[in-house]
């Protein structure tokens, strides 16, 4: 799995990296180290949140995604369009122009991920009404948050909403829709235009599906440049949108929670705020809430690092669009699918096995880490190349650094003590 993460999360341009250590302090899972003056990633710990991409002053972190020409491998191409994409465009009064432009850049069909979002909202409402969920329910729409919970807050896994992400639902429905035209499945390529690297990795890894419904994941930024040119050429558009406000509002933080239709909900965005909420939930200090929506990016999906627009501007545009949409574009009754159709198809697997799979060995390693930690200054300065003293201890015990590696600050203090005694 670490190799898959290396290929489909974030890579490093070592020529650009200046070893400034901004990224090691920003990473929420302490997955980055500075070694020999350059950043390096412990991919088993990476949740693909994109924070290192966002914070890097030298643009040395490169998010992974498929290049646009990947669509050429298929005779028929389907574009899956996230609602956050609509907020990237200025002066586009009708989103059907955006959808029509997709057909001019190489796609035969377009399908809105917002439809999948609407259906997930309706299924969530149904499950709440049937009292089938463990409260408080935690949304699983943001794959970076899902990875964070899976690796760092394992005790909360039972609270996760057991449903597919909207993009997986949209991909399933899109494939079925195209199949009804008599087109062989092997000739159809389904491509998601992603606002963030977390969705790239989640779709490549098939985290909650038994088979991948998506064949490629493109970057909003790359596709945007092609769309802008084509939109400017259009005199008219086709009426292609089937989404309502219920799906559109998923583009920004709070939209999913509002769609769940429960009074006691909470929505938080930004990875530091997400961690704070999860810690409060884990220690029992967060109470009297039934649904929790968490997004790693500021503003929600409009804040993804693969987007082109300022997230606050994009969110404002999305809000202004609401008046042009019906409340619900596609209902469960219209698609005729049972609840099981929307359920996650498999349980999450942990990627991070930092201390090994043998519990006895893992416990012994943990004790060694704690003993070593007692000897350190506990100032989390980052001089050693690790983000914290505890992370340094883990690196020593796990053999990630050469034998004999010591804390430079502790060494300096010991040297000073010796000098004073002399």
Label each PLM-derived region with a short phrase.
Residues 2-14, 18-43, 47, 51-66, ...:
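Iron-sulfur cluster-binding cysteine motifs and their immediate structural context
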């Amino acid at each position: 799995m670490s190799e898959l993460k290396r290929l489909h999360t974030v890579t490093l341009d070592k020529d650009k990296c200046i070893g400034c250590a901004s990224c090691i302090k920003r990473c929420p899972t302490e997955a980055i180290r500075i070694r020999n003056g350059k950043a390096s990633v412990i991919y088993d710990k990476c949740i693909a949140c994109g924070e290192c991409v966002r914070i890097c002053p030298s643009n040395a972190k490169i998010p992974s995604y498929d290049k646009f020409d990947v669509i050429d491998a298929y005779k028929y191409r389907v574009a899956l369009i996230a609602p956050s994409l609509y907020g990237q465009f200025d002066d586009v009064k009708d989103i059907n122009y955006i959808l029509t432009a997709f057909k001019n850049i190489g796609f035969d069909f377009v399908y809105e991920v917002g439809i999948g979002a609407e259906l997930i909202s309706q299924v969530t409402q149904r499950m709440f009404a049937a009292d089938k969920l463990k409260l408080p329910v935690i949304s699983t729409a943001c794959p970076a948050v899902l990875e964070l919970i899976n690796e760092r807050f394992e005790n909360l896994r039972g609270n996760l909403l057991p449903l597919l992400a909207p993009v997986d639902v949209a991909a399933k429905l899109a494939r079925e829709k195209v199949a009804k035209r008599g087109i062989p499945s092997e000739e159809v390529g389904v491509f998601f235009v992603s606002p963030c690297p977390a969705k790239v990795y989640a779709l490549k890894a098939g985290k909650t599906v038994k088979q991948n419904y998506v064949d490629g994941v493109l970057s909003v930024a790359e596709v945007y440049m092609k769309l802008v040119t084509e939109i400017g050429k259009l005199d008219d558009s086709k009426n292609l949108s089937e989404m309502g406000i219920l799906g559109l509002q998923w583009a920004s933080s709070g939209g999913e929670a509002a769609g769940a239709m429960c009074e006691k909900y909470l929505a938080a965005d930004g990875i530091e705020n997400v961690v704070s909420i999860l810690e409060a939930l884990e220690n029992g200090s967060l109470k009297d809430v039934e649904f929790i929506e968490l997004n790693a990016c500021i503003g929600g999906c409009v804040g993804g690092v693969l987007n082109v627009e300022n997230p606050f501007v994009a969110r404002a545009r999305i809000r202004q669009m609401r008046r042009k949409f019906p409340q619900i574009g596609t209902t469960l009754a219209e698609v005729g699918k049972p609840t099981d159709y929307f359920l996650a198809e498999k349980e999450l697997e942990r990627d991070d096995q930092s201390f090994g799979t043998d519990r006895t060995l893992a416990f012994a390693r943990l004790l060694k880490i704690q003993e070593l930690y007692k000897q350190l200054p506990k100032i989390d300065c980052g001089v050693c190349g690790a983000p914290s003293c505890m992370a340094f201890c883990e690196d020593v015990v796990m053999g990630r650094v050469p034998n004999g590696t010591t804390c430079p600050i502790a060494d300096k203090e010991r040297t000073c003590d010796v000098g004073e005694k002399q």
